[in-house]
Amino acid sequence: MARRTRSRAASSRKGAGKAALLLHEKVVLSDESIIEIVLWRLPRPTPDRPHGFKYRLYYGRRGVCLVRYDNEAGKGDHRHVRGREMPYEFKSVEQLRRDFERDVRATGGKDEENA
């Protein structure tokens, strides 16, 4: 059985210019693999994040990252699948999640809906 933690709220960080936490979900699956999704809305778009979101979607097992989508500063949108880094074209939050879940399934994992 999967253990889930979930929060959907504005960030506890107050003040102008701070990113607002929109979503933080973490699921520990029965095989001890972890799916974690964190999404923030930025106060304004940036050159690296023109869509105005900062995100990290992670799937790993026993300390090994199998799939990760993120857009750290200086790198922009990209994904890691089994150790290989590739550019990622961000279209929407919904598409980001669908693409991540597709890669999780392709690596032999389960997405959250099927956990």
Language model features with spans:
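Short, compact, well-ordered microdomains
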Residues: 84-114
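The feature represents the first ordered module of a protein
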Residues: 2-78
